[in-house]
C-alpha cells in the first residue's frame, strides 16, 4: 500500500466498504487512537467485542498486509497528525530538558511495571526456578541480550542457569528438555514465530514455561505456566527502547531478590565462592 497515505485519510476512504463489525473496529480506533497503538490484536478484538479474524480482515480491507503494519501506520498518524503527543521533545529542546525527559521515560516504565507485576506470579516463577534442574533464559533479538543479562545475574548463585544463542540452538535445547526443566522466555509482544516454535517444543518435552511479556492475552502467554507482566508501554515506532529494556531487567532483579531471600544461607555461600573466584580478574 502507499506509504504516503495518512492512516486517517485511508480509513475515511475505505469506511463505506467496511462491514458492520469492521466499522466497530474503526469506531474504536477513532475514539481511542492513542491507546489502540499499544494494543495487541487480541486486546483490540476484546475491546471492540469482535473476533481476532475480524480485526485482521479490517486491516486487509484498508490495504495492510496484517495487524502489525496497520498498527505502525496508526502510530505514525498519531505522531504526525492532530493527535501528536505534546510531551515529546521538540528539535530545539535544550540538553537539560532532554535529560529530564529521558529520566521521566525510565521512571514511567519502571513504575508501570511495578504496578502491573503480580507478586504471586513472581513467587510462582521463583518456586519453579528453584525446583528446576536447569533454567534456560531465552529471547529473540534484543530480548536475547536481556535474557543473557538475567542469566548472568543468577549465575552467581547457581550453575543451573543457561542460555542458547539463536532460534536454532534454542529449539534444539527445547527438544532435549524434560519435566524438571524451566524456560524463562522474554518477549515483549509474546507473539513471534521463533518464540512460539521454541515454546511448543519445550512444552512438548514437559518443561515449565515462564514468560515475561507485556501482553497477558498473547499466544505465548497462553502457553506459559506463569506470566510476568512488563507494564511499560512501547509504541510500534519506538521498538526496542531502552526504558522498556530497563523495565524488563527490573523484573529480573525482583526474581533474583526473591530467589536469594528464599534461601539466604545458600545465597551467602554462593556469593562468597563466586566473589572469590572472580577476584583474580581484578588488577
For each of these PLM feature ranges, what is it?
Residues 28, 125-128, 173:
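CheY-like receiver
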Amino acid at each position: 500500500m502507499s506509504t504516503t497515505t495518512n492512516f486517517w485519510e485511508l480509513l475515511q476512504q475505505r469506511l463505506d466498504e467496511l462491514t458492520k463489525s469492521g466499522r466497530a473496529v474503526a469506531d474504536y480506533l477513532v475514539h481511542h487512537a492513542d491507546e489502540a497503538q499499544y494494543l495487541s490484536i487480541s486486546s483490540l478484538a476484546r475491546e471492540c467485542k469482535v473476533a481476532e479474524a475480524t480485526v485482521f480482515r479490517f486491516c486487509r480491507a484498508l490495504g495492510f498486509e496484517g495487524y502489525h503494519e496497520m498498527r505502525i501506520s496508526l502510530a505514525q498518524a498519531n505522531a504526525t497528525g492532530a493527535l501528536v503527543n505534546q510531551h515529546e521533545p521538540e528539535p530545539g529542546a535544550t540538553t537539560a530538558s532532554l535529560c529530564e525527559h529521558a529520566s521521566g521515560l525510565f521512571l514511567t516504565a519502571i513504575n508501570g511495571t511495578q504496578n502491573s507485576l503480580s507478586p504471586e506470579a513472581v513467587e510462582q516463577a521463583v518456586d519453579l526456578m528453584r525446583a528446576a534442574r536447569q533454567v534456560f533464559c531465552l529471547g529473540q533479538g534484543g530480548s536475547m541480550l536481556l535474557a543473557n543479562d538475567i542469566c548472568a545475574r543468577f549465575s552467581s548463585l547457581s550453575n543451573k542457569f543457561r542460555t542458547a544463542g539463536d532460534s536454532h540452538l534454542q529449539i534444539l535445547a527445547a527438544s532435549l528438555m524434560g519435566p524438571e526443566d524451566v524456560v524463562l522466555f522474554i518477549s515483549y509482544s509474546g507473539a513471534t514465530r521463533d518464540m512460539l516454535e521454541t515454546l511448543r517444543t519445550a512444552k512438548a518435552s514437559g518443561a515449565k514455561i515462564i514468560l515475561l511479556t507485556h501482553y497477558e492475552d498473547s499466544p505465548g502467554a497462553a502457553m506459559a505456566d506463569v506470566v510476568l507482566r512488563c507494564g511499560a508501554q512501547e509504541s510500534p515506532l519506538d521498538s526496542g527502547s531502552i526504558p522498556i529494556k530497563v523495565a524488563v531487567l527490573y523484573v529480573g532483579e525482583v526474581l533474583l531478590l526473591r530467589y536469594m531471600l528464599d534461601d539466604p544461607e545458600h545465597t551467602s555461600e554462593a556469593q562468597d565462592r563466586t566473589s572469590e573466584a572472580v577476584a583474580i580478574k581484578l588488577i
